[in-house]
Amino acid sequence: MATTNATLQTLVQFYENCKNVKTRYKIINGRFGKISILSHKPTSKLYLQKTISAHNFNADEIKVHQLMSDHPNFIKIYFNHGSINNQVIVMDYIDCPDLFETLQIKGELSYQLVSNIIRQLCEALNDLHKHNFIHNDIKLENVLYFEALDRVYVCDYGLCKHENSLSVHDGTLEYFSPEKIRHTTMHVSFDWYAVGVLTYKLLTGGRHPFEKSEDEMLDLNSMKRRQQYNDIGVLKHVRNVNARDFVYCLTRYNIDCRLTNYKQIIKHEFLS
């Protein structure tokens, strides 16, 4: 009881010393969570507060925050509290753009920069996978790049799931692996396939490997059909041979021919 009271008192004091602020980078509410930025007046430190309806709350989100809280490429959690209606998570606010916004600012990124970003992302995901968790929503918007620190941050753990648990069509369709489309159980291949798609987007200014035009919106049937006929020639918009091969190796249709093992992925020439 004493510990509970002390925690409650700390939480009350924290909120008494905070105010809502706006930041220079765009903050977008997710489908299941409302985002606000808090400034702690005594320290001027910024925190990100995520409020999730109890109906949409995934307890694994908290578990991943706690497991990876001290990891340099994940977001540190400070408070987690809730009611019958909502769950609230207070975490570090990272003052940098996500990769979607980075592409909007810079356009197509250089081979060297993309290689650096993807290497850090692969290392971070491998550390998450060691805990038998799949991120399950790797995309441009869920990866931050702090250029001044040369550091990648993996964020938004709301769809994280245990390996071998049941899968559903959650997340962002254009990053779905063939296995996720077929509803196989959760597997690290879900994340590695998404890394392949994300890499292609960074190298081409936001294009998808299987789109026929820049403004095409891919649906589930188009994805299923085009994944089956993926060929290295399809990836023609990536000019660098090593980068093109990396994307191809991570997005091949047949999982037995695809790179899904971290030790093999990290040794690819694109990341060396």
From Swiss-Prot:
Binding-site list for ATP: 27-35, 50
InterPro entries recorded: Kinase-like_dom_sf, Prot_kinase_dom, Ser/Thr_kinase_AS
Swiss-Prot/TrEMBL keywords: ATP-binding, Kinase, Late protein, Nucleotide-binding, Serine/threonine-protein kinase, Transferase, Viral capsid assembly, Viral release from host cell
Enzyme Commission number(s) of this protein: 2.7.11.1
Active-site residue list: 137
Presence of keyword Transferase: yes
Pfam families named among the record's database cross-references: Pkinase
Domain Protein kinase as annotated: residue spans: 21-271
Catalytic activity, reaction form: L-seryl-[protein] + ATP = O-phospho-L-seryl-[protein] + ADP + H(+); L-threonyl-[protein] + ATP = O-phospho-L-threonyl-[protein] + ADP + H(+)
GO biological process, one term: viral capsid assembly
SMART domains in the record: S_TKc (SM00220)
Top class in the EC scheme: transferase
SUPFAM superfamilies listed in its UniProt record: Protein kinase-like (PK-like) (SSF56112)
Molecular-function GO terms, alphabetical: ATP binding; protein serine kinase activity; protein serine/threonine kinase activity
Family stated for the protein in its record: Belongs to the protein kinase superfamily. Ser/Thr protein kinase family.
Function: Serine/threonine protein kinase that plays a role in viral propagation by phosphorylating various viral and cellular substrates including the viral p6.9 protein or host histone H1. Participates in nucleocapsid assembly and polyhedra formation.
Descriptive protein name: Serine/threonine-protein kinase 1
